[in-house]
């Protein structure tokens, strides 16, 4: 679990409570996803973010769906804020519960564009480090799960082999 700093807790709570609704809305409509994003953030609380996304979407004609997490890190390093839109696309496909990391990226970018982010004191390196840390942690968790599954399978195989050997021995003794 990412370390949640006290001043970020309300942000994450709000984000998590609206995330499911956002995912459902984006997947059910046929308009371009960034247009759906604008619709989602039309509430007064998110007006500033909608303006930022609208400006980026109008300013840059690009295939936003081609943006990947690795390209996001490159964009952060080079200061290309168009990746804010890519982040929201990444969030849309984020079904593994990693929204906090994505939202940390998003908050950082909003700060760079609007100077109103709760992550105002985070640097590029710190934000990228958060993501790398989270990715490594998830990888280790997956690795542990795989090892556990493999050991379970190995135990089942041993049990089956033992049963087979016992059955063969019983058959020989009865013959």
UniProtKB/Swiss-Prot annotation:
Record has Cell membrane as a keyword: no
One Pfam entry name: Adeno_E1B_19K
Give the organism the record lists: Murine adenovirus A serotype 1 (MAdV-1)
Any single biological process term in GO? symbiont-mediated suppression of host apoptosis
Swiss-Prot/TrEMBL keywords: Early protein, Host-virus interaction, Inhibition of host apoptosis by viral BCL2-like protein, Modulation of host cell apoptosis by virus
Q: Which residues form a coiled coil?
A: none
Family as reported in the entry's similarity comment: Belongs to the adenoviridae E1B 19 kDa protein family.
Asked if the Swiss-Prot or TrEMBL record annotates the protein with the keyword DNA-binding, the reply is: no
Chain positions covered by the region annotation Disordered: 153-175
Xref: InterPro entries: Adenovir_t-Ag_E1B_19kDa
- Report the protein name in the record: E1B protein, small T-antigen
